[in-house]
């Protein structure tokens, strides 16, 4: 049975950025992706925001994100992704292992 939703993974810089700003940027990215008209399906953003991950180190976050990337129909990279180490790794995983498409939010 085909999934009735388009599962979107959003990759974005998070280090040193407040949760509020991260959520704001994700919403902007979601709206941008919707405006592309890529799919007629309902868009489900994969929840990779790990707010309460006490004791996690950078590679813990990254390993969780890599697992979630495997479930994506598409991956959206938000502005300045190329300045964040984790996003660079996510890009390589998306490029070589995700069956969906890769989208880039334009820089302003």
Regions found by a protein language model. Name each.
Residues 1-108:
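Conserved catalytic or regulatory cores that recognize and/or transform ribose-phosphate-containing ligands
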């Amino acid at each position: 049975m085909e999934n009735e939703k388009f599962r979107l993974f959003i990759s974005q810089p998070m280090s040193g950025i407040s949760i509020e700003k991260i959520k704001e940027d994700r919403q902007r990215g979601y709206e941008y992706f919707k405006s592309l008209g890529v799919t007629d399906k309902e868009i489900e953003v994969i929840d990779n925001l790990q707010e309460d991950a006490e004791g996690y180190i950078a590679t813990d976050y990254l390993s969780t994100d890599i697992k979630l990337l495997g479930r994506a129909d598409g991956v959206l990279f938000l502005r300045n992704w190329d300045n964040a180490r984790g996003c660079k790794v996510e890009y390589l995983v998306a490029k070589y292992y995700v069956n969906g498409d890769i989208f880039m939010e334009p820089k302003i």
